[in-house]
């Protein structure tokens, strides 16, 4: 009974933490716009990237990763007797809360950043981080974000499943089920992207172009600053006023008066 109550508590708290959507928060308070009404309409990292650029997208991703990962880690520390099981159980309900938030009529984001956060804070964080770096590089060459998302979440799901069985992790079967339920949720939320890929109508993100804008903008600001510092002040040109006709007549008349001798 106590065990059941612990899992119910974790599920309840994790769900409501998952409903916090940082793309909506940042879009509204930074740009004063509703992210669900621009771009693809999806309140997630990729739509933030398409709509606002690299900066806000990165901030959204980091916030979602931290939200999911830290929540799972806290519950694992609170209930250490369940090990990785309680960790991924919390991650599952964070994902459910993010994808089906009660506050938005159960219409939320696709959960890729939350999924990444669950694995980036796990005991295989270094593998998840290395795989993220590889997928980040691939994103420069592949303009379809959903393909990179499938590559990342699929690689993590396969890799962690192999790990729990090879290492004999406790509750390996339950952890495996949770991981693949998470993966199934990802596929379900991306069904529209899959259809558009086959119809050749999927939106491109132009990640390379957005990166160029970021670095070119910074480089341009640096060049302007250097030009302002190195720029020498221009020498002032003083223009003397021309004498008026009255001044010239008096100046001419004065020496003539001096030359004429006085008469007694």
Where are each of the predicted segments found?
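Multi-pass membrane catalytic core of lipid/isoprenoid biosynthesis enzymes
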Residues: 50-76
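Cytosolic, membrane-interface loops and tails of multi-pass inner-membrane proteins
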Residues: 24-55, 108, 195-214
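Interfacial segments of multi-pass membrane proteins
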Residues: 49-52, 75-79, 93, 112-142, ...
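Long, low-complexity, intrinsically disordered segments
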Residues: 233-264
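N-terminal signal-anchor transmembrane alpha helix
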Residues: 5-30
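Helix-coil boundary and interhelical linker segments in multi-pass alpha-helical membrane proteins
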Residues: 1-9, 70-89, 120-127, 162-178
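Alpha-helical transmembrane segments of multi-pass membrane proteins
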Residues: 14-17, 94-98, 135-139, 156, ...
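Short, non-helical or kinked segments that cap or interrupt transmembrane helices
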Residues: 33-44, 102-116, 144-155
């Amino acid at each position: 009974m106590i065990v059941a109550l612990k899992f119910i508590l974790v599920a309840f708290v994790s769900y409501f933490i998952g409903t916090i959507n940082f793309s909506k928060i940042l879009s509204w308070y930074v740009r004063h716009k509703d992210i669900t009404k621009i771009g693809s309409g999806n309140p997630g990292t990729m739509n933030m990237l398409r709509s606002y650029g690299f900066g806000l997208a990165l901030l959204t991703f980091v916030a979602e990763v931290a939200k999911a990962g830290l929540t799972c880690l806290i519950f694992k520390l609170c209930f250490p007797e369940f090990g990785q099981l309680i960790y991924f159980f919390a991650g599952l309900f964070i994902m459910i809360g993010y994808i089906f938030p009660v506050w938005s009529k159960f219409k939320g984001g696709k959960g890729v950043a939350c999924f990444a956060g669950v694995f980036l804070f796990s005991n295989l964080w270094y593998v998840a981080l290395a795989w993220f770096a590889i997928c980040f590089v691939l994103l420069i060459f592949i303009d379809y974000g959903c393909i990179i998302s499938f590559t990342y979440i699929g690689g993590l799901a396969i890799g962690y499943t192999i790990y729990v069985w090879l290492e004999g992790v406790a509750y390996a079967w339950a952890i495996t089920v949770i991981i693949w339920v998470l993966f199934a949720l990802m596929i379900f939320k991306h069904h529209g992207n899959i259809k558009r890929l086959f119809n050749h109508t999927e939106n491109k993100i132009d990640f390379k172009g957005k990166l160029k804008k970021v670095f070119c903008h910074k480089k341009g600001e640096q060049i302007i600053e250097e030009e302002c510092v190195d720029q020498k002040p221009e020498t002032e040109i003083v223009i003397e006023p021309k004498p008026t006709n009255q001044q010239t007549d008096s100046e001419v008349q004065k020496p003539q008066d001096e030359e004429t001798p006085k008469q007694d």
